[in-house]
Swiss-Prot record:
HAMAP family: ProA. Pathway: Amino-acid biosynthesis; L-proline biosynthesis; L-glutamate 5-semialdehyde from L-glutamate: step 2/2. This is Gamma-glutamyl phosphate reductase. GO terms for cellular component: cytoplasm. One of its GO terms (biological process) is L-proline biosynthetic process. It is an enzyme of class 1 (oxidoreductase). Belongs to the gamma-glutamyl phosphate reductase family. It catalyses: L-glutamate 5-semialdehyde + phosphate + NADP(+) = L-glutamyl 5-phosphate + NADPH + H(+). It holds the Pfam family Aldedh. The gene is proA. It is found in: Cytoplasm. It comes from the Bacteria. GO terms for molecular function: glutamate-5-semialdehyde dehydrogenase activity; NADP binding.
Length: 414
């Protein structure tokens, strides 16, 4: 079986990766970046096959956009690898050190997790981001992308693995599962002892499948039913700009807004302005009964709309009585990703920050900033929506764990 063979190679490579010096890792990342640029034509030809097949199957435009590569996106992947090379290596850091009364020095040292399995869908850039971040954090990585992007992923992964190996990275540190059979994923999720952690990136069904079926520990990522609450005191121009950015800039990503909640006190004045602007960008509005009464041209929202991550130019809109109803709605329907309030009321802003139980909570800013690069972490491997180990954008530190190191001078326990 392909996945078992590659997992064994990865496990062997991970032991060597754990003690690799920072200079070697950084040199490999730079060479990997250069290799992507030098082989851009090869990547684009492979990607063209995937895009043509996606269009033949009539996939949504937003999904084709996530799949599609061009020279600009390849350059961005290369820049991401170079940025990771410039980041501080967390491996070996002593985070805390204390001395016990008996003279023992006890410290917490950052160490690699080991072998990380990535299961993801359409975006080929994840192949480069995941390989680079796992490498810098001293981990081996097994990549399993979606069948939609198989040609692109094979091209990118082979280029990266070859460049890394030539730079002194152990063979088997970067591997792609080329078999698109779902049984390979099922086997991958059961490889306890060979794979230390699985990180799924994709839609609801993929993440749900991994969480429910993996016996290997999982970090839940991604699904983003994100909300923006426009409070009664909000600056209308600011609110409009934030909502348009959060919905229109890249609707097919997990930090795009899916539901806007509007305070009843401003609904009649604000909604027509917002709907007009969004409609000019091709956004379909699905509104509650009161929204539809104020803006008759919008579609009627159903219960399902409040719980849907559209990943498309569709937005659910609901008028709420006050901040209490907004918080209640978010608590019921949020996936714990990113939520924002637009307000000039300090008390409401602070209450929103404290009350909303999501990985990223904003005041007067777009949810689109929930991103490793925007947070200053460099490329991210995913956005965790769980509370254990990692939460929010996962950078280098989140791809390590720690161990206790104890320095003694002959102490024995009495």
């Amino acid at each position: 079986m392909e996945v078992e063979v590659k997992a064994k190679k990865a496990k062997e490579a991970s032991r060597k990766m754990a003690v690799l010096d920072t200079e070697t890792k950084n040199r490999a990342l730079i060479n990997m970046a250069e290799a992507l640029l030098e082989n851009a034509d090869k990547i684009l030809k492979a990607n063209e096959k995937d895009v043509l097949e996606a269009e033949r199957r009539n996939l949504k435009a937003s999904l084709v956009d996530r799949l599609k590569l061009d020279e600009k996106r390849i350059k961005a992947m290369a820049e991401g690898l170079k940025e990771v090379a410039s980041l501080k290596d967390p491996v070996g850091d002593i985070e805390e050190m204390w001395i016990r009364p008996n003279g023992l020095q006890i410290g917490k040292m950052r160490v690699p997790i080991g072998v990380i399995g990535m299961i993801y869908e359409s975006r080929p850039n994840v192949t480069a981001d995941a390989a680079g971040l796992c490498l810098k954090a001293g981990n081996a990585v097994i990549l399993r992308g979606g069948s939609d992007a198989i040609n692109s992923n094979i091209a990118i992964a082979s280029i990266l693995a070859e460049a890394a190996y030539k730079s002194g990275i152990p063979e088997g540190a970067i591997q792609l599962i080329e078999n698109t059979d779902r049984e390979e994923v099922n086997r991958m999720m059961k490889l306890n002892g060979l794979i230390d952690l699985i990180i799924p990136r994709g839609g609801t069904s993929l993440i749900k499948n991994v969480i429910e079926n993996s016996t290997v520990p999982v970090i839940e990522t991604g699904v983003g039913n994100c909300h923006i609450f426009v409070d009664e005191s909000a600056n209308f121009e600011m609110a409009k700009d934030i909502i348009v950015n959060a919905k229109v800039q890249r609707p097919g990503v997990c930090n795009a807004v899916e539901t806007v909640l509007v305070h009843k006190g401003i609904a009649e004045r604000f909604l027509p302005v917002m709907v007009k602007e969004l409609s000019s960008h091709g956004v379909e509005i699905r509104g509650c009964e009161l929204t539809k009464r104020i803006c008759p041209d919008v579609k009627e929202a159903t219960e399902e709309d409040w719980a849907t991550e559209y990943l498309d130019l569709i937005l659910a809109v609901k008028v709420v009585e006050n901040i209490d109803e907004a918080l209640e709605h978010i608590s019921k329907y949020s996936t714990g990703h990113s939520e924002s309030i637009v307000t000039e009321n300090y008390t409401n802003a602070m209450r929103f920050l404290k009350s909303v139980d999501s990985a990223a909570v904003y005041v007067n800013a777009s949810t689109r900033f929930t991103d490793g690069g925007e947070f200053g972490f460099g490329a991210e491997i995913g956005i965790s929506t769980q509370k254990m180990h990692a939460r929010g954008p996962m950078g280098l530190k989140e791809l390590t764990t720690y161990k206790y190191v104890i320095l003694g001078s002959g102490q024995i326990r009495k």
